[in-house]
Amino acid sequence: MASGNAHIGKPAPDFTATAVVDGAFKEVKLSDYRGKYVVLFFYPLDFTFVCPTEIIAFSNHAEDFRKLGCEVLGVSVDSQFTHLAWINTPRKEGGLGPLNIPLLADVTRSLSENYGVLKTDEGIAYRGLFIIDAKGILRQITVNDLPVGRSVDEALRLVQAFQYTDEHGEVCPAGWKPGSDTIKPNVDDSKEYFSKHN
């Protein structure tokens, strides 16, 4: 795995890529999403096994993300033509069916390399997930090895947590969910949280 140019707290590397959006080819730029949160997830290959479970799960929750002012983008090293063929394959046959999220083509592998998820010996991407805030700043990175899929619920929770901290200036403890207690980030005020939870 290459180190890439994606660093927490820094601007996310911009990109332009051809994507399949609503069954058609479209040029997509990260900068087009400025003002919104973005969940950018990489997956190894089309027509595989774990990948469709993740893509369909993200697609099924696309509206939940949009309600938070967040868009979801999927990326693999496959071409837009392969993406479209997979989308046009019925789910019962291992295809994706219609999607509510764009799938970006990274045939040059520049996105995967720039984001540090390229598995160079195979030329495919690890399962990287990046949360980018409305200002284009990278807030979260996770990278899974190939055989284990990611949790859409956890990605939603993380977006909600970062948005909460942005708005309220408080910090979110382990396992925080909307409506749960948060911590005021100073020594004296934080005792209010710790006295309730210990």
Swiss-Prot record:
EC identifiers of the protein: 1.11.1.24
GO biological process, one term: response to lipopolysaccharide
Domain of life: Eukaryota
Active site: 51 (cysteine sulfenic acid (-soh) intermediate)
Residues the record lists as Phosphoserine modifications: 112
Top enzyme class: oxidoreductase
Keywords linked to the UniProt accession: Acetylation, Antioxidant, Cytoplasm, Disulfide bond, Oxidoreductase, Peroxidase, Phosphoprotein, Redox-active center
PROSITE patterns registered for this protein in UniProt: THIOREDOXIN_2
InterPro entries: AhpC/TSA, Peroxiredoxin, Peroxiredoxin_AhpC-typ, Peroxiredoxin_C, Thioredoxin-like_sf, Thioredoxin_domain
Thioredoxin domain mapped to chain residues: 6-164
GO MF terms, alphabetically ordered: thioredoxin peroxidase activity
Compartmental location: Cytoplasm
Similarity comment: family membership: Belongs to the peroxiredoxin family. AhpC/Prx1 subfamily.
Protein's job: Thiol-specific peroxidase that catalyzes the reduction of hydrogen peroxide and organic hydroperoxides to water and alcohols, respectively. Plays a role in cell protection against oxidative stress by detoxifying peroxides and as sensor of hydrogen peroxide-mediated signaling events. Might participate in the signaling cascades of growth factors and tumor necrosis factor-alpha by regulating the intracellular concentrations of H(2)O(2).
PANTHER family: PEROXIREDOXIN-2, THIOREDOXIN PEROXIDASE
Protein name: Peroxiredoxin-2
Lineage, broadest ranks: Eukaryota, Metazoa, Chordata, Craniata, Vertebrata
